[in-house]
């Protein structure tokens, strides 16, 4: 017992204090941590299964990790302990971001034990990690016999301090202090022991003692289901009453006198400020439920000292917040249903248009219940507003007549008003659809089945084979002749029937195929030459100007327009130097060809616009390659 006393004194447990009330053993705000605690317990402490179970498992759960921690960093930390068989950082299935915990598997159980002893609560990328035995048996994880709850902890007490305090009573499977979004302690936590006896010893010795000058309460952990069932029972048999709108001159003595006629009062509490003045509300706790119920019935809305009192069942803070949220949500839905189909959103308003002018413009279409132009803090118009009609028919008529109408030299945009969350959801769906289309294009360019991809080949020109400097053929067929077929279905000439070279080393198109030019060819002196997508004008050295490209596109069949645009895009993509992989340029070209022809023409003329679309396509290609490598 001397060892136990010494251990407790190290953590400032100074003296025994009065026992905390049993009915307040577990607060309602432990729900968040309970989920975390169950996750910890889910990963925790296989060592509780006995020596035989321990020898069969050498898997550790490592929690509280920084999102930047990866498998390589964990291997550097754990490999000096012993031979590591595998490491897995758990990630979100969609975003692939770390969930903040990982599993480390050793070949030997002894190495796992040593890792817990030496590395538990050590800093990993600036955060103290929690290491426990992984327990994959759900029946053992959910066993709460050895689980205790501690509240009123000092904010300075972290996971390690809590572990050091309670490890004196037995073997700990998991230990955690609840924290908020900023990592600050919520002043309560959980300790899960291997045995129920160790938990009982901790409750007996630490409950009601001072830890860092704070009296702590330690009790058995009660599951959420049990708490809720108990809470419903407490609500039906409440004894604690909340009173507000009290006059400033009401003190504790007068407060008690007001409620004594309804039954025996066990305690009263009047809330005061720092100066000791009443804050106008307090609590009265009766000995039995009947007295509390009578007080609520008789005193609610009764006037005392010129103030109409509110008297009702005392609620926990969380319960009250939930009730307010439900009330707010019902009010919001009622308001939305009331204005569904009658409230219009109007934008592109001139700065001179105010709410009165807006109402005048829309008044001919029906009865307006409200019209408002939104303004900033300085009172200047934001360029948009809302008009609410009395019926959906009037609103529909206003949309038909006023949308795109010129007002003060600006065309109005008029549509049904949407909630912010609906607009955000629609935008997210559009972005998701666009990203999905890009990924489909990348997959199609990679030749995955089930995806349609226009047959094109970017490396040699479809429709002919490049002649050498002497006018003969050079090199074998391309690796995939089908990729060279035009959509019209013409086949390249059989092997051995090579087209001869034309004047100036220009290739002669294969019979029946459109004369599409471009790609790299051998010139008269055997040099590589880059040509445009169209035959160059004899009177000029370069290819056609981009401004003529749209006119030329309009003269060719629809099924060949993408091919021609692709021959323009491909050399431009290659020229960026960013498509490093052999097949990258061709696949990115295929992705960018998914745009409308007008957009592609704009890309070819605007380098900045081209760069933006190229970067998006390159990113999609790189993500696809990473996913392919992972598979």
Swiss-Prot record:
Single GO biological process annotation from the record: nuclear-transcribed mRNA poly(A) tail shortening
Location (main, coarse): cytoplasm
Subcellular localization: Cytoplasm; Nucleus
Domain of life: Eukaryota
Pfam family of the protein (one): MLLE
A Gene Ontology term for the protein's cellular component: cytoplasmic stress granule
Segments forming domain PABC: 545-626
Residue ranges of the region described as Disordered: 1-56, 518-545
Record bears the keyword Iron: no
Sequence ranges assigned to domain RRM in this UniProt record: 58-136, 146-223, 239-316, 342-419
MF (Gene Ontology): molecular condensate scaffold activity; poly(A) binding; promoter-specific chromatin binding; ribonuclease inhibitor activity
Sorted UniProt keywords: Cytoplasm, mRNA processing, mRNA transport, Nucleus, Repeat, RNA-binding, Translation regulation, Transport
Role noted for this protein: Binds the poly(A) tail of mRNA. Appears to be an important mediator of the multiple roles of the poly(A) tail in mRNA biogenesis, stability and translation. In the nucleus, involved in both mRNA cleavage and polyadenylation. Is also required for efficient mRNA export to the cytoplasm. Acts in concert with a poly(A)-specific nuclease (PAN) to affect poly(A) tail shortening, which may occur concomitantly with either nucleocytoplasmic mRNA transport or translational initiation.
Family: Belongs to the polyadenylate-binding protein type-1 family.
Designated name of the protein: Polyadenylate-binding protein, cytoplasmic and nuclear
The organism of origin for this protein: Meyerozyma guilliermondii (strain ATCC 6260 / CBS 566 / DSM 6381 / JCM 1539 / NBRC 10279 / NRRL Y-324)
Organismal lineage: Eukaryota, Fungi, Dikarya, Ascomycota, Saccharomycotina
